[in-house]
């Protein structure tokens, strides 16, 4: 027999608005051939989606369990000079790869669902794996690693089983002795339900138009409602 478990998801709102003058719209159309409303709508929708993505990433950082807790000089920190036991840089980077493997194995041991298969890391960590000769770039990034400063970047596949993503804002996290360099290993199964965190949209992104009652100038806004919820069977710092 089996049972169906359920959990409550509270939908919250996220919205952005913008105002512009009719004179601006007229000049922009006459000089540059651009539609002011369309340009602002594109900016607002892109910003909202970017904020949602960052919220998901921050949530992952917050609830992720500490890795590198065994056979390291300092729990939670993998020191390339001490813990890797390598003689030169490439050997040290391969030691880092072994530690990532251990953390991926820990996910399989804890969840019994599967081994970790997603890595989100800082740019220097991805570069270290590249120098070790274990990161195969996608065709678009065959020449060099092009890190996008506006969002998480898919860097390539590690050993044919780990999808590696670079967080371009990683410099703002944990700027202590490790210089803000880190990685997070996660698991995502083949089924949509086989994950640890779910994005649950309630109301899709909607556009609203209005006119100011005093200025008679146009206003536009975008609003969406959604929730983030952990897998009821997942284990993290907040579970």
Annotated model-derived regions:
Residues 4-23, 27-29, 34-38, 42, ...:
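Sequence/fold signature of self-assembling virion shell proteins
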Residues 22, 33-35, 39-102:
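Alpha-helical scaffold segments that mediate packing/assembly in large oligomeric complexes
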Residues 27-30, 49-70, 102, 106-117, ...:
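Intrinsically disordered or highly flexible coil/loop and linker segments, enriched in small
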Residues 71-145:
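Extended, solvent-exposed, turn-rich assembly/linker loops in the middle of proteins
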